[in-house]
Every structure is written in structure tokens, then in C-alpha cells.
């Protein structure tokens, strides 16, 4: 009983840290966008948390963890609506005594909200609030739990080749971050760029954020929250495993920041703080798939490459005329893919067969997210539309969608 209590307390602390990450996401988005859209961003982030928990409680948790209630074996299952540990529930045997059923739900519920938050940042400053809420609801209700069930719920990813050779994603480089990133990519493709982002020749133009110090604070809060995101994914308070997981997490974050800063200096002859910050986040996302499998040196390599991936993928989006105001897609999608593949290249599971499993499952998850993300986006577009009109975009979504300003009479011109 004492071991259960210790493990459960650790899991609850980690749950609180993951919840705290939503403040970091809010600060990051506010700082990297314009003042006239602050309330809109805060509203979306509050909605994501509240909606995510209700949806995950209502059916998402049992869709992601169906147990023996399969509809399509290994692909889709559903254990019924609501939360119910069952008549045979024993807190001492649940999850091998690692934590209680209720802690399990709450910890995983925080992850569900994160996937929708990734979409929020990428679509900032031009999406209709009702359209965003509909897309976020459907994505969290359908796409996220189904993809998650393929590994974490005991689906076909977990035994992709055999019982001993399955997909591995420790804390969600693909199952959380890339899932959110694919959704964001689909939505911004149909949504279009912000007014003034590209000139008549298609050249990208800078739209400066309103508060870089606030976005920097957001990144540091997110880094702190990752102690819970990855540390909690150990699913116990095992001192050795939690310690090495947090060490690799921090080293990858540090290396990601350095990698992005140095590479952007080489390419653009500029020490770009926003690249530095997103490099840190890219390192965190990259290590998330294999944080428990890596030695410190491998974590540094993963982080350094993730930093380079961030810089290159920002340039790629600009080349494709895709507008992502906060860099959510470079950080969460591209670094999520890299980190997932790195499990097959570095660490305890490295090997050709494991790499091919990782590659195949990344492709399957991506294809599923793109197909269903496109269907959801086009469905919402047909009913509600996606984008505010040019006048509303120019005024700012705070006034256009919410009828008020974030800072009252204070303004920056």
C-alpha cells in the first residue's frame, strides 16, 4: 500500500505539471502573435482544457483504452461511455499497483488536451472561434484516442511485427505531438495564411509578435511541464527510470536550443531568439518517444538534430506558403517524426527492424490523421466556414469574436 501511495502521488504531481503546460502554451502563443488577438488565444486554450477533459471523460478514455471490448480487433474498440473502474476494480492491482484508475484518467486527459492546443497555435489570428471549437472537439473526440489506442491501448501498433517487435513511443512524440501537428498542417492548408504574411511574389514577410519576453516565459514553463509529461510516462516513481528520463529530457531540450540557434546563425547570420526557443521545444518533442531508452549522449544528438529540423522546417513551410505563427508544426510534427524514428537509430531499441516499424507506424498514423483531419476540416468549413473576413482580421479577433480588448485602453502601435 505504501508503494502504491508513493507511485500515485508522483503521478498526481506529474499530472499537475502537464496541466501547467497549458499556461506555457498560452504564454508562447500570446507572445508570438499580435496584441489584438490575445483574448482569442486565451479563450481557445481555456476551451481546449475544459472541452478536452469532458470529452475524454465521456468517451475518449474508453475509446483509447477499450480493454477487451474490440469492435475491429486491434484497430478500434470502445469500453462504453463515462468513467467506471468496474466491479472487479482493485487499486492495489490496477496498473501493477502503480497508480489508481482515477489518476490514470486525469493524467491521460491532460495529454488529450495537448493535441488540440497544438492546432490552436498554428491557426492563430485568422480562424473563426466557432470553427476552431468544432474542429478541436472532433479531433480530440475521434482522431487522438483512436491513434493512441493503437499502441497505448494495446492495439496493432504494440505488436506490429510480433509480441517482441512493436512500435515504441514512450510519451507521445507521434501519438500526441505528431497527431496534433498533422491536424494543424491540414487546417492551415485549408485556412490560408494571415493577411500580409506573403507579398505578391510569395516572399514571406515578418509579422512580429507582441511580447517576446512572455513567449520566453512560456517556453520555460513548458520545459518545466515536460518533467511531468515524460517523468509521468514512466507510470511509477521508480527512482532510476524517472531520473534517467528527466536527464535525457533536459539534455535534449538544451541541445535542441543550441542546435537551432547555431544553425540559424549559419543560415541567416542572425541569433534568432524565437528559433532558439522553438529549438528547445523541438528537442523536448524529439526525446519524448525514447526518453527512457536513451543514454545522455544519444539524447544530445536527438536534441541537436531536432534543433536543425526546426530551422529547416520553418523554411519549408515558408516555401510552401503555409503560415504557422508560433512554429507549432516544425516543433510538434517534424520533430515528433524525427524523435520517433530516432528510437530505431539510437538507444536500447536501435536496429533496422525497429527503425522500419517506427517508420511504418509514423506513416500509418500520419495518413489516418490527414484523412480524418481533412474530413473534419471540410465538414466544419461547409457548415460554419473557417476564416474570419479581412475586416475582422484587421481589427483583431479580440474585438471581432469577443467584443473586447485584452489590455483596455493600453495599446502598442
Show where each model-derived region lies:
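Hydrophobic alpha-helical transmembrane bundles of multi-pass membrane proteins
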Residues: 1-413
Amino acid at each position: 500500500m505504501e508503494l502504491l501511495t508513493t507511485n500515485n502521488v508522483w503521478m498526481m504531481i506529474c499530472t499537475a505539471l502537464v496541466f501547467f503546460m497549458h499556461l506555457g502554451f498560452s504564454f508562447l502563443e500570446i507572445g508570438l502573435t499580435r496584441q489584438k488577438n490575445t483574448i482569442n488565444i486565451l479563450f481557445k486554450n481555456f476551451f481546449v482544457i475544459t472541452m478536452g477533459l469532458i470529452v475524454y471523460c465521456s468517451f475518449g478514455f474508453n475509446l483509447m483504452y477499450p480493454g477487451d471490448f474490440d469492435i475491429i480487433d486491434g484497430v478500434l474498440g470502445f469500453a462504453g461511455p463515462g468513467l467506471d473502474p468496474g466491479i472487479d476494480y482493485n487499486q492495489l492491482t490496477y496498473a501493477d499497483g502503480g497508480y489508481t484508475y482515477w489518476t490514470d484518467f486525469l493524467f491521460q486527459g491532460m495529454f488529450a488536451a495537448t493535441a488540440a492546443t497544438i492546432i490552436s497555435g498554428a491557426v492563430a489570428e485568422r480562424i473563426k472561434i466557432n470553427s476552431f471549437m468544432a474542429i478541436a472537439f472532433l479531433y480530440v473526440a475521434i482522431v487522438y484516442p483512436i491513434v493512441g489506442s493503437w499502441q497505448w491501448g494495446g492495439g496493432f501498433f504494440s505488436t506490429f511485427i510480433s509480441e517482441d517487435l512493436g512500435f515504441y513511443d514512450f510519451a507521445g512524440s507521434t501519438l500526441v505531438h505528431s497527431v496534433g501537428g498533422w491536424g494543424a498542417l491540414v487546417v492551415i492548408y485549408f485556412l490560408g495564411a494571415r493577411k500580409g504574411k506573403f507579398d505578391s511574389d510569395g516572399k514571406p514577410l515578418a509579422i512580429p509578435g507582441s511580447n517576446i519576453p512572455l513567449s520566453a516565459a512560456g517556453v520555460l514553463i513548458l520545459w518545466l511541464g515536460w518533467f511531468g509529461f515524460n517523468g509521468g510516462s514512466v507510470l511509477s516513481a521508480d527512482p532510476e527510470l524517472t531520473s534517467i528520463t528527466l536527464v535525457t529530457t533536459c539534455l535534449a531540450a538544451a541541445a535542441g536550443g543550441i542546435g537551432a540557434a547555431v544553425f540559424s546563425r549559419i543560415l541567416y547570420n542572425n541569433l534568432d531568439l524565437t528559433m532558439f526557443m522553438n529549438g528547445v521545444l523541438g528537442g523536448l518533442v524529439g526525446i519524448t518517444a525514447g526518453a527512457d531508452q536513451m543514454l545522455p549522449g544519444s539524447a544530445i544528438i536527438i536534441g541537436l538534430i531536432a534543433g536543425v529540423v526546426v530551422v529547416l522546417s520553418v523554411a519549408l513551410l515558408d516555401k510552401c506558403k503555409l503560415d504557422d505563427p508560433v512554429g507549432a508544426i516544425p516543433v510538434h510534427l517534424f520533430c515528433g517524426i524525427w524523435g520517433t524514428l530516432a528510437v530505431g537509430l539510437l538507444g536500447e531499441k536501435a536496429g533496422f527492424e525497429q527503425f522500419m516499424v517506427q517508420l511504418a507506424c509514423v506513416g500509418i498514423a500520419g495518413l489516418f490523421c490527414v484523412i480524418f483531419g481533412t474530413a473534419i476540416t471540410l465538414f466544419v468549413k461547409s457548415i460554419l466556414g473557417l476564416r474570419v473576413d479581412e475586416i475582422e482580421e484587421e481589427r483583431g479577433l479580440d474585438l471581432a469574436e469577443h467584443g473586447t480588448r485584452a489590455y483596455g485602453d493600453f495599446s502598442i502601435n
